[in-house]
Amino acid sequence: MATDLHRPVKTLLETGPADASPPASHNGADAAVRVEGLTRSFDGRAVIDDLDLTLKAGEFTVLLGRSGCGKSTLLRVLAGLDREISGTVLVPRRRAVAFQAPRLMPWKRVWRNVLLGLPGKPERAVAEQALAEVGLVERAGAWPKTLSGGEAQRASLARALVREPDLLLLDEPFGALDALTRIKAQQLVAELWQRRGCAVLLVTHDVDEALLLADRVLVMRDGRIAYDTPVALDRPREVGSPGFTDLRSRLLTELGVEGAGRATGLSAQSAGHAQARTESAESPDASPARPHPHHGDPS
């Protein structure tokens, strides 16, 4: 079960019989992810430092933090894309990733992109079913270069969903979208999560986005989870709804931008991106590794 330095991340199915029950979280609920004592270093500096984390099955968790704090590195470890680690990491075998850049192969039509990395020779109908779920089936035969930004991101989501994941990992998937398309994409992800019932971990700088989507919000600082709060707000949610403003203020404080939203009229999204830009873009966490399709990544 443990993953020693230079050894692979273990999946639930690799650590026991195929019909074994998933591990229990600290509160007794089934856990989709369990991490204990995880450390990942770059050039002698621990980007993730003895981190512990449990994600419950079916829970939508959002991870916030400054650039370079280790959040994208953590996501890559959970995806199986970064294995130079020490510690214990248990994740479902069926997992998938969607990144900010859709990473579609320009020489393959959309439906073929959706099927990339799947074992065997799945038929076009399999891709079209996933594309229909994200409202893009009519573009199945299109070339990626003809897609809008929002369409390309939906194709990326279809590529993740076709794997029937128990864990969906999202690394700022809405960051490059315009405001209206971003809202629509957020709504789509919320609908897909409620329909699929898988665990979701979303990395973002947008505090409002976190509160609109999450069951639980984590703030990462100095390679560890520094703040962990449930989001006990009724769904569907709106910015400014009861309890929303207080939670936003608390999260902005944890992110080191206390008073930014209230004093200047700056939105929580803008505040989050502003604090992110103050950090070095040269950190290991800010430079995602190229994904490997055999570890559950949809690229």
Predicted regions and their residues:
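The feature captures the beta-strand-to-loop junction immediately N-terminal to the Walker
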Residues: 64-66
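Helix-to-loop junction immediately C-terminal to a conserved catalytic motif
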Residues: 79
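ABC nucleotide-binding domain "signature" region
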Residues: 122-134, 250
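Conserved ABC ATPase signature
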Residues: 143-147, 151-153
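Hydrophobic anchor residue at the start of the ABC signature
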Residues: 157
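A short, proline-enriched helix->beta-strand linker immediately N-terminal to the Walker B motif
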Residues: 162-166
